[in-house]
Curated annotation (Swiss-Prot):
Its main location: cytoplasm. The modification N-acetylalanine is found at residue 2. This is Threonine--tRNA ligase 2, cytoplasmic. The modification Phosphoserine is found at residue 453. It is found in: Cytoplasm; Nucleus. One of its GO terms (cellular component) is nucleus. Residues 86-98 have a biased composition (Low complexity).
Amino acid sequence: MAAEALAAEAVASRLERQEEDIRWLWSEVERLRDEQLNAPYSCQAEGPCLTREVAQLRAENCDLRHRLCSLRLCLAEERSRQATLESAELEAAQEAGAQPPPSQSQDKDMKKKKMKESEADSEVKHQPIFIKERLKLFEILKKDHQLLLAIYGKKGDTSNIITVRVADGQTVQGEVWKTTPYQVAAEISQELAESTVIAKVNGELWDLDRPLEGDSSLELLTFDNEEAQAVYWHSSAHILGEAMELYYGGHLCYGPPIENGFYYDMFIEDRAVSSTELSALENICKAIIKEKQPFERLEVSKEILLEMFKYNKFKCRILNEKVNTATTTVYRCGPLIDLCKGPHVRHTGKIKTIKIFKNSSTYWEGNPEMETLQRIYGISFPDNKMMRDWEKFQEEAKNRDHRKIGKEQELFFFHDLSPGSCFFLPRGAFIYNTLTDFIREEYHKRDFTEVLSPNMYNSKLWEASGHWQHYSENMFTFEIEKDTFALKPMNCPGHCLMFAHRPRSWREMPIRFADFGVLHRNELSGTLSGLTRVRRFQQDDAHIFCTVEQIEEEIKGCLQFLQSVYSTFGFSFQLNLSTRPENFLGEIEMWNEAEKQLQNSLMDFGEPWKMNPGDGAFYGPKIDIKIKDAIGRYHQCATIQLDFQLPIRFNLTYVSKDGDDKKRPVIIHRAILGSVERMIAILSENYGGKWPFWLSPRQVMVIPVGPTCEKYALQVSSEFFEEGFMADVDLDHSCTLNKKIRNAQLAQYNFILVVGEKEKIDNAVNVRTRDNKIHGEILVTSAIDKLKNLRKTRTLNAEEAF
């Protein structure tokens, strides 16, 4: 042990000396560079030599740090073994000798301690050995990190002073490698410092307690910011991960924030998580929060991290397959140390209220051939009111769940014999067909041409389009006469074949192909969810083939199209322009021109929009559209995406005005509803099953006052049915008139038509609505005309407007 201690001290001493050498050499490099600028004709050999020497020293230092870490770890293990031996010897000696009885106060303290330990044991079932080993290594690395920080901050001259520009315009002075964003916030206002979730330094998310490394622009983000929410929920996931390790003793995998909350996946040998265990996990999380465990960040070499996480094959996979740099970061809170890019909140106490509410099983990285994992979901907020509002929202969302509405209203169902493929019953099929008819009507107004294309293609098509290389695992494939075929997951390659089947001229452009073809995607069984995630679906899919000069007008037309459709449904929407990413393909001049035209289209459209720089697809810029439903949720359905690459892949050309027969078109991928199935799910939940009249699967219920009026009721129902309305008649003799009316209202019939002897004589009906608004007696022909007009105009509040 003494030899290892001496070796560790020697390595540490050498490391510190070489850090000093690096600083001196680097200052020499700077000095020589300055001299070179002032004397350009002098010898310039020293600078490169010195920078190479600095690089060599740094490489050697990296190796020294690793050796130092290993020596310290061995030293710590040896000390731990020595302490265990000494403790065992002491216990043996105490057992051999007589011990005095404990005092009353000592006895009481012992009882309290045992009670606390038993309470903790009732929640925490396992404390794996790897936790202790992991902590030991982290502490050694932390000491090294603190030593480096001390070295960086040693100068003590004016070069240590940095300027921090806060987003509100204030300027604050600080010290490099010492001043933190939290200290800057506290200098402005302690209230601001406490309400800040995370910092943004020079555009990069930054831990509040992480020292600044130079002059900085600083933003202080609170929970109402989306990026801050993601950090808050990511930190909450670490709290859940800590609780899961203590409770289950399994191996953690991924624990990200999601749109509303967070989850953590864990591999647990030979068992599954039970929903009855979630309250126990929540209690552990609350205890962790009370401890205010600080989040500590360390940058560590990949080699050392593979040693740290050698017990966990999943973390090692991430390191080997996902980490392409020599170092990466880990974060610690309490006993948990997790491979993580961060950043995080200052300490666990910042999470004011937490709820662990759901569990499920999944596969490692979604691959059913890999290990089964247990996934646990949670949500957290900075105050109790937000949690109460969330719980209320969840109850409302539960009542609006499209699967519940679909079952109650007999719209659709799913069956194990065809997972992910919906069976639409007559009333559900009415909604489906009404939506597609609506879009077809709009197509006719906007000069779209509907086409029909095959459902399956030879794999050579997908190889040509590029989908085979990146998407084949999501396609249903099969062999026919030794060739591989696949059911189409999208329409665009087929439409490219349609464009290319004969020569095209500029006079034809733009060509707008629309297709309701059936699509299939091989979604994993665990991801299937009602109508929102299916394997078989249809889209209101269209592809516009146009010239570069026509992009602006075509985009304007697409925006007007989606506004017309979404306003009919009563949706508001958000627009985001996603521009050229770093890995873009094609000529930059074409990208610039296309992005300019997209911006012009959005400006002329007149609705608010935001820029998402670098978030476009590699093959073209796009406009992302999100609709907002009745309970405040956002859904992305529409697509407006430019594509410069498919025309190249399929060698699509047209003859231009000046006779160039090699001119490339641009493709605009465009959908408004997106998946018709998913849109039905969104509409079901948006309306809560109270469908607007034009889309309603239960538009009219005719109720006779008594048996003598039943024949007339059937006649009235038949007249409405012949005009295309979803009309029914209630002839149930076991119910009173009032009960029949109430049943029709609960079943969400938009209009209830009561007929008695008077109405029979007058050839009329007595009209009331599902909300019990009474319109009174009206002739059958007049009622039909009014309802036809309300259907034609797709009036949202038809019951009021009748």
